[in-house]
């Protein structure tokens, strides 16, 4: 459901960006954000095919790894209740109007003066709606590979680790009070 701040597949997608940054680019990203409009279909219970992954993630988006300030990361996190999925290390509390009262990454408040590594998609890195928020990243690396290919590999990895099972969940990353 693209109108909610969390979905099982949206959460898996954001976690998959963290995994892809680490496994394919040797980068330990602090945060991942995936736009909710980029997830276009659900994946039904049962065997997951490449066609299922392509239907869910039909756009030719690349992985974009950004280094940004904590101040700009906070600004990006304010968009989460409206249209972004985040990785499990992020906890965000907002009211129904979108006012964010709490954001933590790995249990810590975001430090305006610290730098953070963000795994996202080039759609977010290049989209005017986000570039004004992100400012000029301190560093940026874009992949040649498409996100859907990374996510397909992530789903295989999860299946291998969990006796063939992949389970997405809504787990309280984003709480609307």
Outline where the language-model segments fall:
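Glycine-rich phosphate/diphosphate-binding loops and the adjacent beta-loop-alpha structural elements
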Residues: 1-6
């Amino acid at each position: 459901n693209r109108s909610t701040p969390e979905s099982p597949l949206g959460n898996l997608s954001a976690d998959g960006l963290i995994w892809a940054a680490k496994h394919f680019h040797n980068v330990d990203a602090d945060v991942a954000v995936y736009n909710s409009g980029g997830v276009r279909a659900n994946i039904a219970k049962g065997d997951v095919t490449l066609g299922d992954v392509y239907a869910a993630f039909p756009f030719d988006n690349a992985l974009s790894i950004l280094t940004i300030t904590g101040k700009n990361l906070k600004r990006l996190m304010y968009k989460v209740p409206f249209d972004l999925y985040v990785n499990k290390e992020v906890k965000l509390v907002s009211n129904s109007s979108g006012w964010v009262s709490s954001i933590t990454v790995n249990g810590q408040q975001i430090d305006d003066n610290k730098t953070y590594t963000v795994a996202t998609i080039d759609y977010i890195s290049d989209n005017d709606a986000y570039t004004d928020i992100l400012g000029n990243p301190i560093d940026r690396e874009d992949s040649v590979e498409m996100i859907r290919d990374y996510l397909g590999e992530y789903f295989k990895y999860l299946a291998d680790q969990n006796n063939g099972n992949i389970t997405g969940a809504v787990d309280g990353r984003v709480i609307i009070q």
